[in-house]
Regions:
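RNA pseudouridine synthases
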Residues: 1-222
Length: 222
């Protein structure tokens, strides 16, 4: 594949993940983004041995967008700390089923991972085993049947955006796991990680990497 490198320095690399591709290899043995980035670095710097690449965050397989990797141990430690401390700002775009009643809103709920079904269950109040989840959404545009939202995460839980939007009866287009009426081609879902803002690994300098929402979505907003 042709890797879309969005930013690179001595300690980190930011690339665009295609929707449908794994970030990290799993038992399926399907191609993954980490292997592609390692291949790119090995060829670019003519490295003969193994290439270090640190995974500091993830995107679900059916989601495309901005992904950040560490190229050094120091980079991995400092970037992981930023994600852990929630100092990284993340924005997403999503096409959801239905028309929104408001122009913007906030969803606060409690999520619990069902390991067997690989889904996040949503609760309106805290119960044992749940974690608080918060997101903010703003309507960008709408069509006859769907709406385009810009989403900012207040927390970073597994399947958070997918589960929380479904909980207010606006599942993400194509996300049949969370109640969308039908899948999209190639089992993608209309969720895109559009922006990451973070501090560089060895400098006190803020960096924002952005991508526009996929224009292929326009047909879902007519």
């Amino acid at each position: 594949m042709k890797l879309n490198v969005l930013y690179e320095d001595n300690h980190l690399i930011v690339v665009e993940k295609p929707a449908g591709m794994l970030v990290q290899g799993d038992k399926t043995g399907d191609p993954c983004l980490m292997d592609e980035v390692k291949k790119y670095l090995k060829e670019k710097y003519k490295k003969s041995g193994n290439v270090f690449l640190g995974l500091v965050h993830r995107l679900d397989r059916p989601v495309g967008g901005v992904v950040l990797f560490a190229k050094t141990g120091k980079g991995a430690s400092r970037l992981s700390a930023q994600f852990r401390e929630r100092s990284v700002e993340k924005y997403y775009f999503a096409v959801v089923v239905g028309k929104m009643k408001e122009k913007s809103g906030k969803i606060v709920s409690f999520l619990k991972k069902d390991e067997k079904k690989n889904v996040a269950e949503v609760f309106t109040c805290e119960v044992p085993g749940t974690k608080r989840a918060e997101l903010f959404w703003e309507q960008v545009s709408s069509g006859k049947e769907n709406s385009l939202l810009k989403i900012k995460l207040g927390t970073g839980r597994t399947h958070q955006i997918r589960a929380q939007l479904a909980s207010i009866n606006h599942p993400i287009l194509g996300d049949v796991k969370y109640g969308a009426p039908k899948p999209l081609p190639d089992k993608f879902i209309a969720l895109f990680a559009a922006s990451l803002s973070f501090k560089l690994a060895t400098q006190d300098e803020a960096k924002t990497i952005e991508l526009p929402w996929p224009k292929v979505w326009e047909k879902y907003l007519n």
